[in-house]
């Protein structure tokens, strides 16, 4: 793609409206489905945007080319977390604002621990960062599938495209920023996308990611990298927030990023580390390669 070379994008203009329209078109394309669908709504910026756009199109009848309201089916949104987790509170606000039928799933730390063996089996890794994020999604997918929903939209990919991770604040210049987004995108299929796909597919649920839609990527990655940068105290993904600030509650549109596993509840990762350190001895780790000769921990 032409945008893989910084020289081809460094002088490009920045059109916020074009970005807005491109993402709406991407979500509309991803909604093409002959099975019941829903949206993953964590309460963060990315999933809130995809959910708001999905609701916009799901609320209209296709047969009338979007001119008449659709009375059925209603769009269902899903959020998971420990009780009183930050994500659950934020997701509730978004669902109320956009009008989805919202399902709030609570899980306990013990339920997460009980699912660990199955989660590791399905995601095929014991990397702690991947496991801690996969477990809530695995538990959520079970509930989604039990309701007969077979496809969900997710917000994966936005952080890689727009430099949403906090370390992007330290990018020394636009070229370094752009090249890091390219690096993150090139590795995405090995980590976040694979993790989400395996967690959902374990229960027969398909996940779709509008932020990684090919046509949308061409628009988003051709933006001048300077417009995506977040130096100093500027909040990450500012251009994306500006594009959809009218579609979301203000406190959501300008909410700072949290990791999914932190957003579902801070106690989850702390307990996971504690249980692991108590269950596995230093001697067992030293002999791990003998017991697990293929890809030892």
What are these regions (language model features)?
Residues 249-259:
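Conserved S-adenosyl-L-methionine
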Residues 2-248, 262-275, 285-288, 294:
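ATP-dependent adenylate-handling active sites, centered on carboxylate activation for C-N bond formation
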């Amino acid at each position: 793609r032409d945008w893989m070379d910084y020289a081809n994008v460094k002088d490009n203009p920045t059109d916020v409206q074009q970005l807005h329209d491109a993402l709406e078109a991407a979500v509309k394309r991803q909604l093409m489905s002959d099975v019941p669908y829903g949206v993953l709504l964590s309460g963060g910026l990315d999933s809130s945007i995809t959910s708001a756009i999905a609701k916009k199109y799901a609320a209209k009848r296709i047969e009338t080319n979007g001119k008449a309201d659709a009375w059925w089916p209603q769009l269902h949104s899903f959020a998971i977390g420990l009780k009183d987790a930050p994500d659950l509170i934020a997701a509730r606000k978004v669902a109320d604002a956009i009008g989805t039928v919202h399902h709030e799933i609570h899980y306990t730390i013990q339920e997460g621990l009980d699912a660990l063996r199955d989660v590791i089996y399905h995601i095929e890794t014991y990397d702690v960062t991947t496991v801690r994020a996969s477990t809530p999604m695995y538990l959520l997918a079970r509930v989604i599938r039990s309701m007969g929903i077979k496809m969900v939209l997710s917000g994966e990919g936005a952080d890689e495209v727009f430099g949403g991770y906090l370390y992007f604040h330290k990018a020394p210049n636009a070229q370094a920023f752009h090249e890091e987004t390219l690096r993150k995108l090139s590795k995405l299929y090995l980590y976040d996308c694979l993790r989400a796909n395996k967690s959902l597919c374990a229960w027969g649920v398909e996940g779709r990611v509008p932020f990684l839609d090919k046509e949308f990527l061409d628009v988003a990655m051709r933006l001048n990298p300077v417009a995506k940068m977040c130096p100093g105290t500027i909040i990450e993904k500012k251009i994306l927030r500006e594009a959809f600030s009218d579609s979301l509650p203000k406190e959501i549109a300008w909410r700072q990023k949290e990791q999914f596993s932190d957003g579902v509840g801070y106690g989850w990762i702390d307990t996971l580390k504690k249980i692991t350190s108590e269950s596995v001895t230093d001697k067992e780790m030293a002999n791990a390669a003998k017991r697990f000769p293929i890809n030892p921990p």
